Amino acid sequence: MKYIIIGMHCAGKQEVADILENKGIKCGRQFTNLENTFAANIYNGGNYEQYTMKDVNEIFENNAYIFMHEFPWGNELNFSPIKYYEGLSLYEFENNDVFVMSPHQLFSISPASIKDDVCFIWMDNTKKERLNRYYTEKRTYSFSNREEIESKDMNSFVKFLYGFDKSRVLYFTNEDPARVAAIIYSLIKYPDLINIYTEAYN
């Protein structure tokens, strides 16, 4: 079973993954060819794997990715004409258990490309809660720009989320990331709990 934590920016997705990783759970990292200074300080807390453009081209040519697309916040990167990409390699997906994605990234995936059983952890936090995290963590990207882009995906998000074969969904709103991490951890250790949890949290 693969566990994919889904939510808009500032929902606490990465905090959940960090807690799990500290407990020994294997968490996959996305890649980007965006320079480390920008990836670390502005976009994803340094949680991307840094790849060269050559690496990105090889992944693309070998079709060795779960998703890959041009970096969606390119309008904020006006310092260079270089194209930047982000994605999740097939190797990372096959060798880890937990992943973090935005709705925008999930829409880049063909449901047929995922053969494993999947449990989506949907962190549907309110704008107020996400704004609080944005200011508390002193994030520096444009909240309104990110909100505008990600909000476009939400209208068809629910239907798409349930379109994956062999998928389960756990839904949380404004939940403490530590509690979400504890539930994922228990599911990884005791997979038979999945039916109880999906019935309780849908």
Where are these predicted regions, by residue range?
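Hydrophobic anchor at the beta1->P-loop junction of P-loop NTPases
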Residues: I5
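Post-Walker A helix-loop "phosphate-sensing" segment adjacent to the P-loop in P-loop NTPases
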Residues: N22-G28
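ATP-dependent small-molecule kinase phosphotransfer cores
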Residues: Q30-D97
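Conserved phosphate-donor/acceptor-positioning beta-strand/loop module used by diverse small-molecule
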Residues: V100-S102, I114-Y135
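Small-molecule kinase domains that catalyze NTP-dependent phosphoryl transfer to phosphate-bearing small molecules
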Residues: Y135-Y190, N195-N202
